[in-house]
Amino acid sequence: MQKLIKTSCAIAAEEIGKEKADRIADAAQKRYEELLAENAGDSKALQPHTFRRIYPAIAAYEAFRAEGIESEKAVWYVREYFQRDAAKKVPHLQRMIRMFGLAKKIPKLFMKISVKSFGPEAGFKYEFPESRGNEARFNIVRCPYYETCRRYGCPEITRAFCDGDDAGYGNLHPKLIWGRTKTIGRGGDCCDFLLQYQN
């Protein structure tokens, strides 16, 4: 079973019970496989986003809703998957940054990795405001996470991805300031990414 589906349903089981959660997981897995078949033509650059994150989230959300779970709660179960995933990964990143003295280099690395992994080939469109000092600053003005979720009638789950970014980047190091103030998924006109090193 796909990881996001399995974990978000296990989180739901804490409240709704294992039997119902297992039924939802089975339905979500089936829907996920349908989404993969429907979108087999996704570009290689887009697939890491859609196949691993977006389609599983849509499938889980739809399955939660089909079982009568309110929209806000269904979004919360998906969001909680990303929160718990970040809680596992961030301490490792913090150790690496401290151990190798990488804090100063992180903004440039973040910019390089972001533009490569979230590039135009994957459906993202950028603007690059002027950077000041040691920072990564860019605006995403077109986001396939939002566009795909909207196409499937559930743009509200996009904020679960946005919140996952905040959990992942918001506490990497005391001198690294995560300064994003808005996202398309939360109703903004862009996602104004900012990761800044401050002495």
Segments and roles (model prediction):
Residues 134-140, 144-148, 152-199:
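C-terminal non-catalytic interaction appendages of large macromolecular assemblies
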Residues 28, 32, 80, 84, ...:
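Solvent-exposed, non-transmembrane amphipathic alpha-helical segments
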Residues 52-58, 62-153, 157:
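Amphipathic interaction/junction segments at domain boundaries or subunit interfaces
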Residues 1-64:
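N-terminal, charged low-complexity regulatory/assembly segments
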Residues 18, 70, 174-175:
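Short, well-ordered coil loops that connect the C-terminus of an alpha-helix to the N-terminus
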